[in-house]
Amino acid sequence: MTNNTRGYIQLHPFHLVGPSPWPMFTSFSLMNLALSLGLTAHGYMNNNMFMLLSTMTVLYSMTLWFKDIMAESTYLGDHTVAVKRGLMQGFLMFVVSEMLMFSSLFWAFLHSALNPTVEMGMSWPPAGMEAISAAELPLLNTMILLASGVTMTYAHHALMNGNRQNTLYGFAYSTLLMVLFVMFQGLEYTYAGFTITDGVYGSTFFALTGLHGLHMMMLIMMLAMCTMRVYNYDFTNTSHVGAETTILYLHVLDVMWLFMYMIVYWWGA
């Protein structure tokens, strides 16, 4: 939380964060979201109001948390060189953990695809399962993600050169492309001929693509935040840790989607 009190001489370059309610508030909001999602999926709740309310509280708490972090970094000067280095290292560790999580799901998919059992009809996809064509919406989403990589690289180069207007355009276009991707992914789910309960194919397919979709939603929030910060002159060509982590996150998710397209949609279908 933002802390304006400086009653001591700090003899180290690190930021000692003051008490903040947002980690606890976000944790309880995420717990409520998970519970409401599970209860709704299993038919214990007849409407989505509690799930929508939990989603709103998660977004609200994360917005205020980000607001405090931006105030500490931009206006209070708490993010020294050592703090920025630690933030980048922590984000890299987060990216590695995400790659390991996706690797486990790819392992589950390939384990069943390379050795289909009798119960699946000795074939992959299982007998009677109509897979989604790789030449339809998945191909369009792949083109959208590749285009977002181009616009993001354009924004990064503009930011490094101190060109605020082109940086703003690059982040705005990237945000729009990510929103289109999530919309088309939802449309694909709507018209899919199977669900997450349709055996190992449905569960691994929706686990992989759904997890990627959740990360894309988080990326949209990060891109929107970066767009707002560029608009408010918060970034400079030498200090833009938030932009660097967002750019790295987008490229990592792009690579994950390319593997997903080749393995799940093209080869796996």
UniProtKB/Swiss-Prot annotation:
Keyword terms: Membrane, Mitochondrion, Mitochondrion inner membrane, Translocase, Transmembrane, Transmembrane helix
Database matches in Pfam families: COX3
Enzymatic reactions: 4 Fe(II)-[cytochrome c] + O2 + 8 H(+)(in) = 4 Fe(III)-[cytochrome c] + 2 H2O + 4 H(+)(out)
Protein name: Cytochrome c oxidase subunit 3
Localization annotation: Mitochondrion inner membrane
PANTHER family per the UniProt record, alphabetical: CYTOCHROME C OXIDASE SUBUNIT 3, CYTOCHROME C OXIDASE SUBUNIT III
Family classification: Belongs to the cytochrome c oxidase subunit 3 family.
Annotated TM spans: 21-41, 49-69, 90-110, 132-152, 167-187, 205-225, 247-267
Cross-referenced SUPFAM superfamilies: Cytochrome c oxidase subunit III-like (SSF81452)
Major place of residence: mitochondrion
Gene3D superfamilies: 1.10.287.70, Cytochrome c oxidase, subunit III, four-helix bundle
Superkingdom to which the source organism belongs: Eukaryota
Subunit structure and binding partners: Component of the cytochrome c oxidase (complex IV, CIV), a multisubunit enzyme composed of a catalytic core of 3 subunits and several supernumerary subunits. The complex exists as a monomer or a dimer and forms supercomplexes (SCs) in the inner mitochondrial membrane with ubiquinol-cytochrome c oxidoreductase (cytochrome b-c1 complex, complex III, CIII).
Gene Ontology biological-process entries: mitochondrial electron transport, cytochrome c to oxygen
Entry's Gene Ontology cellular component terms: mitochondrial inner membrane
InterPro entries per the UniProt record, alphabetical: Cyt_c/ubiquinol_Oxase_su3 (IPR024791), Cyt_c_oxase_su3_dom (IPR033945), Cyt_c_oxidase-like_su3 (IPR000298), Cyt_c_oxidase_su3-like_sf (IPR035973), Cyt_c_oxidase_su3_a-hlx (IPR013833)
